[in-house]
C-alpha cells in the first residue's frame, strides 16, 4: 500500500509521516532527497551554477541563497525545478521498486507538490493534512516564511480545496500530537495495515 501526503506548507506533513512510521511504514522524504541532490547531482548543480550566480558554494547548492531566486520564479527557475523533479522521480521509482521487492506493506510519500507534479499517480491513497490558519501561520513564522514567499508558493500549488477533493482521508494537525497520532492509527486500522 502506498499512501501519499498532501496539504499546504506548514501543516505538519512531516509529523504525520513520522506517525505512520510508528505503524511500520517506510517514508520517502522528498525534501531529504532534494537536499542530497543539491550536494551530489552534477547536472542540477551545473545548471544552478550557470543560471543562479552565487548559489553553488564548495561544489554544493546553498539552499538559503537558492531560495532568493525562487522569488523571481522565472523560466530559469522553472527549468531548474523540472530537473529537480525528474531526479526526485527517479529516486522515487527506485525507492518503490526496492521496497516492493522486499514485500514492504506500507510506504508513505512525503512529497511537496505531490498533486501538481503527478507523483500521486504512484499512490493507492492520498491523505490531506490540514491545520487551521492560526496554527499554520505560527508554524510558518517559526520557519521564517514571509507572506511574499507564501503567496508565491501558493500560486504554484493547487488550491487547498482541490487537494482536499482529491484526497481519500483528512488529518487535522491543529489540536495536538496525540490527536494526530490517533487519526493516523484510525487510517491504518481502517485499512488493516498494521505491519
UniProtKB/Swiss-Prot annotation:
What metabolic or biological pathway is this protein involved in?
Answer: Cofactor biosynthesis; coenzyme A biosynthesis; CoA from (R)-pantothenate: step 5/5
Residues that bind ATP, according to the entry? 10-15
Which Pfam families has this protein been placed in?
CoaE (PF01121)
Q: Which GO terms describe its biological process?
A: coenzyme A biosynthetic process
Q: Which reactions is this enzyme annotated as catalysing?
A: 3'-dephospho-CoA + ATP = ADP + CoA + H(+)
Listed A to Z, the keywords are: ATP-binding, Coenzyme A biosynthesis, Cytoplasm, Kinase, Nucleotide-binding, Transferase
Identify one Gene Ontology CC term for this UniProt entry.
cytoplasm
Entry-linked CDD domains = DPCK
Q: Which NCBIfam families match?
A: dephospho-CoA kinase
The identity of this protein, by name, is Dephospho-CoA kinase
User: Which source organism does the UniProt entry give?
Assistant: Wolbachia pipientis wMel
User: Which lineage ranks, top first, belong to the organism behind this chain?
Assistant: Bacteria, Pseudomonadati, Pseudomonadota, Alphaproteobacteria, Rickettsiales
Name the gene for this chain. coaE
Amino acid at each position: 500500500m502506498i499512501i501519499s501526503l498532501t496539504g499546504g506548507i506548514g501543516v505538519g506533513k512531516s509529523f504525520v509521516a513520522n506517525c505512520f512510521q510508528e505503524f511500520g511504514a517506510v517514508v520517502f522524504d522528498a525534501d531529504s532527497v532534494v537536499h542530497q541532490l543539491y550536494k551530489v547531482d552534477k547536472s542540477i548543480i551545473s545548471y544552478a551554477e550557470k543560471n543562479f550566480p552565487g548559489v553553488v558554494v564548495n561544489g554544493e547548492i546553498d539552499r538559503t541563497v537558492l531560495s532568493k531566486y525562487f522569488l523571481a520564479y522565472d523560466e530559469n527557475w522553472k527549468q531548474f525545478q523540472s530537473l529537480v523533479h525528474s531526479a526526485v522521480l527517479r529516486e522515487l521509482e527506485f525507492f518503490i521498486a526496492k521496497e516492493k521487492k522486499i514485500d514492504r506493506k506500507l510506504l508513505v510519500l512525503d512529497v511537496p507538490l505531490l498533486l501538481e507534479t503527478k507523483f500521486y499517480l504512484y499512490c493507492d491513497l492520498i491523505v490531506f493534512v490540514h491545520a487551521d490558519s492560526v496554527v499554520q501561520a505560527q508554524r510558518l513564522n517559526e520557519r521564517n516564511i514571509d507572506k511574499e514567499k507564501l503567496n508565491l508558493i501558493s500560486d504554484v500549488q493547487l488550491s487547498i480545496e482541490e487537494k482536499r477533493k482529491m484526497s481519500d482521508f483528512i488529518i487535522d494537525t491543529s489540536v495536538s500530537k496525540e490527536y494526530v497520532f490517533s487519526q493516523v492509527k484510525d487510517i491504518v486500522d481502517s485499512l488493516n495495515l498494521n505491519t
